[in-house]
Amino acid sequence: MLTTSTRQKTCDLATLAIDLIDQAGCEYGDIRFCTYRNQTLHAHDHSLSHLTDHQKSGFGVRVLLKGAWGFAASYRQTPEELIRMVNLAIEIAKGSRLCQQNPVRLVPVKAYQDTYITPIKIDPFSIPISEKANLLLTINDRLLQYQEQGIRKANSYLQFNQENKLFASTEGSLIEQTIYRSYSGYRCTAVANGDAQSRSYERPPLNLGYEHIDQTDLLSQIERVAEEALEKVYAPKGPSGIQSTLILKPTNLYLTIHESVGHPTELDRVYGYESNFAGTSFATTDQLGTLQYAAPWINFKCDRTQPAGRSTIGYDDEGVPSQEWYVVKEGILVDYLTDRETAYRLGKSSSKGCAFADSWSSLPMVRIPNLGLEPGPIGGSHTATLAEMIADTKEGILIDGIGSFSIDQQRRNFQFGGDGFWQIKNGKIVGMLKDVTYHAMTTDFWNQVDAIGPASEWQQCGTNMCGKGEPLQIAQMTHACVPVRVQNINIGG
């Protein structure tokens, strides 16, 4: 939260900006004052290898003049600089009109005067650096107790973020938000048998305070992670050039959801406004309401109100309140991820609130919200626990964690790896594998899911490093999901 004096100064600047934008005859305008604090600690083996704790702040002004966008930003938060940036944004909008084919139009949004703060129990920045460093070194020391068996490297990390944002618009909104985010994990590498293999564990990135850094949980997983790294380095390589049944844990499935459902349903990517980082999308608007994206028992739901979700906020960067909606309902593509501009082009009456900028100096763009796979209903014909899926599989592979991945320029064809792999035979896990990859066409993959986990196995996995745009912007989101079983998937090759 801003101090009272700082908030008043910022509100005065925001009022000045909005008045200037209105006086210039713009159809719309907004301003964001943002302050970001980021703290990261990394430990490598027996030493703290990386420590940053920095803060940056500034403001960005966006105007829509005669159907064209203009944007300007600065770190100097003074009346003189603000006036200069508003005028610059207006001049840029005038220049943009010279090469613009179609004018920008926006769906309406109500005016909001509100405050949102991430509910936390412990401010992560109140914990001494020494305590955090000692936790990481303790983790590494315990991992390296397996050095004689073959563990050669240990790495651990902690990441904390605080974002303060004040948003004002010509619609009449004045919204102040404070977002907290926490993340931790570790990795060890076994070297033996002429090979090197790693295993990882993380407390997933979530919008929580230091209470998310559960030391008991982190320390209790060390023995398992080290032993699995050692087993993995001696394990046989996975099969290649065959089809197999896959059982995917949420720790692996979330990235598949991210790449094959999240990005293809970003409406700016569908329209071709955005084509960096794996291109546009096959899920075009002429297929809305008809495309059999997944099996009829599959539902993908967006929810920016999800407690602790990595993209959970009160409002997006256009002042649109957070909400929830389906993008795939009973297997059918039913909606997209939109901001006010793309929603208007689609013919919708309102935005889904997906506009986000990663900095005061960045333009908002459509970003994936919390997007998850709904659990199977109790008693559903395709609902099964992870244990039941394994017991019901004659031959297959169980995958945990994420590895390498790639996807084509329309998000049709993908390949994913993982971090841990186990061979299943006659309903039992018979040992680890290594170097397994699976690949499929997006709609084939999701239509071949024949079992999904119940709500009791729902996990909030996700990413804090989703890149999009040029210049690059980074966003974060949760892909809460359950285990699934998928039939006849290509392995390796």
Go through each PLM region and give its residues.
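Active-site bordering "gate/hinge" segments
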Residues: M1-E324, K329-I332, N426-K428, T442, ...
